[in-house]
Amino acid sequence: MKVVKAAAVQISPVLYSREATVEKVVKKIHELGQLGVQFATFPETVVPYYPYFSAVQTGIELLSGTEHLRLLDQAVTVPSPATDAIGEAARKAGMVVSIGVNERDGGTLYNTQLLFDADGTLIQRRRKITPTHFERMIWGQGDGSGLRAVDSKVGRIGQLACFEHNNPLARYALIADGEQIHSAMYPGSAFGEGFAQRMEINIRQHALESGAFVVNATAWLDADQQAQIIKDTGCGIGPISGGCFTTIVAPDGMLMAEPLRSGEGEVIVDLDFTLIDRRKMLMDSAGHYNRPELLSLMIDRTATAHVHERAAHPVSGAEQGPEDLRTPAA
């Protein structure tokens, strides 16, 4: 049975620099490749960084200030030199890489998850379908085209970001599509220990229901970085310690390694796919333990288009001259 060496990566972005953060990610992919890692998950929108500032700034402050503008400037276009660099690093390491970026498409930002196969090919670009609370001031909404599991060199991979793990239908879409490895991403630092505890519930429950491995990555900010990007604007809210929970969960919902709760590093675990079969013999949520004739999910995986073109058809008589359109005399 197949065994895949997987890594959940806890890493700090280089604030306000897309290029420096990408360089750091590329270096980490190389290091993991030297350790024989075949699959790696990086944190939510780690390139260039998660918009932590939006948790404490009002809409007016975001519009008149510089934080949102800087993020727009440093965001990632897909494809671009930034994505090319990550793909090339994945190719050189022979590694499947799942990573979160702030994607810029025109004048709109999206919380986007990218998946690169071991040959460096970008095989999935999905956007968070519903940004959470204050995130809606920053990101647009994604569509259903990315709510699917994708075949890769290491198996079928599904991706969700942060509070999407509280959407049971989104999770079931991936379960029913046969994901074997679930790549979960959260922002981590600055949201408190309660955030980490709820995250643990989310990812362990998803592993239990899906019968898949969950490789979960959170980002780390040190105290100086938190003070730099999260400024108390008078609402009495500032940085909160805690919020990281980088780990890997087995298909039966049990933790396979002690989670990283602070600092940079990675959790590396060998994923024995026999464990998937053992779990699904007991409970296959999209198979023998389901009743699709009673309960089923409808999903629209159509990619959203802002313009829909229709072919022009001549109106009856439009090709006739004025003389031809006269009403015949009685």
Curated annotation (Swiss-Prot):
Keyword terms: Hydrolase
Active-site residues from the entry: E44, K128, C162
tRNA-binding is among the record's keywords: no
Domain of life of the native organism: Bacteria
SUPFAM superfamilies in the record: Carbon-nitrogen hydrolase
Reaction(s) the record says it catalyses: a nitrile + 2 H2O = a carboxylate + NH4(+)
Enzyme Commission (EC) number: 3.5.5.1
A GO molecular function held by the record: nitrilase activity
Protein's UniProt keywords contain Hydrolase: yes
CN hydrolase domain sequence ranges: 4-273
Region (Disordered): 310-330
Pfam family, one: CN_hydrolase
Family the UniProt entry places it in: Belongs to the carbon-nitrogen hydrolase superfamily. Nitrilase family.
This protein's name: Nitrilase 3
